[in-house]
């Protein structure tokens, strides 16, 4: 429930910033250094990606088909706002409960990610992955 609430909050912030789903994929891709994969993996075709980049460029968030420093800053701001708005749920859950919960689910998550890597490849489930160098 907490995870879904965080996702819903994240989408609400994206909407409030007038960032489309394709633009969100492009910004997230740049943040994780995925090489242009995320927006396509979420169903955006070349035309939608081109239009999304044009919209980002008109706002100074991209230049020549590359997300700019300003675009990365907006992506980070959205993440920070999401964290700020959703931290209360974890605080009310408490540190001890959170640690017990993480100790229980992290091994399952690690096995799931290994299975995804083995079957679908290392690009799937970008939200569950660390930023690439």
Feature map (PLM): residue ranges:
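Short amphipathic alpha-helical interface segments
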Residues: 2-51
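Ser/Thr-centered flexible coil motifs
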Residues: 20-21, 68, 94
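Basic amphipathic alpha-helical segments that dock to polyanions
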Residues: 48-62, 71
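Accessory beta->alpha helical hairpin/"wing" motif in late/C-terminal subdomains of nucleic-acid enzymes
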Residues: 63-81
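Long amphipathic all-alpha helical oligomerization modules
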Residues: 78, 82, 86-90
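Terminal interaction helix/tail motif
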Residues: 88-131
């Amino acid at each position: 429930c907490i995870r879904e609430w965080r996702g819903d909050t994240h989408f609400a912030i994206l909407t409030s910033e007038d960032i489309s789903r394709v633009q969100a994929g492009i910004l997230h891709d740049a943040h994780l250094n995925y090489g242009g994969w995320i927006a396509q993996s979420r169903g955006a075709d070349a035309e939608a990606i081109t239009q999304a980049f044009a919209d980002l460029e008109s706002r100074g968030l991209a230049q020549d088909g590359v997300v700019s420093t300003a675009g990365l800053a907006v992506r980070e701001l959205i993440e920070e706002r999401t964290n700020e708005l959703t931290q209360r749920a974890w605080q009310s859950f408490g540190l001890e409960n959170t640690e017990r919960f993480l100790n229980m689910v992290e091994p399952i998550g690690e096995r799931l990610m290994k299975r995804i890597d083995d079957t679908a490849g290392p690009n799937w489930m970008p939200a569950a992955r660390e930023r690439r160098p």
